[in-house]
């Protein structure tokens, strides 16, 4: 990485809520630090069955008018937008089909929280909230696994063929010389 920085991650547990915060310090006296940062929480799914069609659901907040970009070549994305696969109740199934093209990337501050539900569509597992502009949700492609990753990001995966400087990447963060930037990566409220 071409910049010096100090990263501090803190976790706090209060009741049933686990909070993850990050501080990014720029030790330089002269250079602006350009960076992206995100979390990588994975949630185990209690109804995992490798032979099931759907092993749980996700309820985004808000859940109307959503669209995503999809990861493709080496985790990069193209410019096309796609409809979010949702049930009539506005739930996103956790299935091989949903993640057939790897990640669902909600950008533009579309989703500020995601509740994970058991396969019965009623029982809440947990609710992840965040303040990041991007929420990336993924599971392994072509194979159900016993978890789903719900990742808030202050930044965005690269576009296919990307050749733009770090300072003008979508949702890039910038710390001025000597500055410490604070980010709430996520809060997870456990419901089970």
Stretches found by the model and what they are:
Residues 1-41:
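Acidic, contiguous internal or C-terminal segments within carbohydrate-active enzymes
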Residues 12-17, 28, 47, 118-120, ...:
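A short, structured loop/turn motif at beta-sheet edges
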Residues 13-15, 24-28, 41-45, 62, ...:
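Beta-strand elements of well-folded, non-transmembrane domains
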Residues 117-161:
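Glycine-rich active-site loops that engage anionic ligands at enzyme catalytic sites
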Residues 160-168:
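Short, structured beta-strand/loop micro-motifs enriched in basic residues and often containing a Trp
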Residues 32-34, 42-45, 49-130:
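Active-site/ligand-binding surface loops and adjacent short beta/alpha elements
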Residues 22, 173-190:
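Short Pro-Gly-centered flexible turn/kink motifs
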Residues 8-10, 169-176:
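Beta-strand-rich interaction surfaces with strong enrichment in secreted/lumenal proteins
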């Amino acid at each position: 990485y071409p910049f010096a920085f100090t990263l501090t991650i803190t976790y706090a547990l209060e009741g049933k809520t686990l909070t993850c915060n990050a501080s990014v310090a720029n030790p330089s006296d002269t250079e602006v630090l350009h960076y992206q940062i995100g979390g990588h929480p994975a949630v185990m799914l209690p109804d995992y069955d490798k032979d099931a069609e759907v092993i749980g659901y996700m309820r985004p907040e808000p859940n109307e008018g959503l669209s995503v970009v999809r990861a493709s070549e080496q985790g990069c994305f193209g410019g096309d937008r796609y409809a979010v696969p949702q049930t009539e109740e506005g739930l996103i199934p956790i299935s091989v089909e949903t993640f057939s093209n790897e990640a669902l990337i909600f950008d533009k501050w579309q989703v500020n929280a995601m509740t994970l539900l058991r396969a019965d569509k009623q029982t809440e597992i947990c609710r992840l909230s965040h303040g990041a502009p991007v929420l990336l949700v993924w599971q392994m492609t072509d194979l159900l696994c016993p978890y789903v990753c719900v990742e808030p990001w202050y930044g965005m995966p690269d576009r296919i063929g990307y050749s733009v400087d770090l300072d003008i990447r979508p949702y890039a963060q910038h710390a001025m010389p000597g500055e410490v930037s604070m980010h709430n990566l996520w809060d997870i409220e456990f419901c089970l």
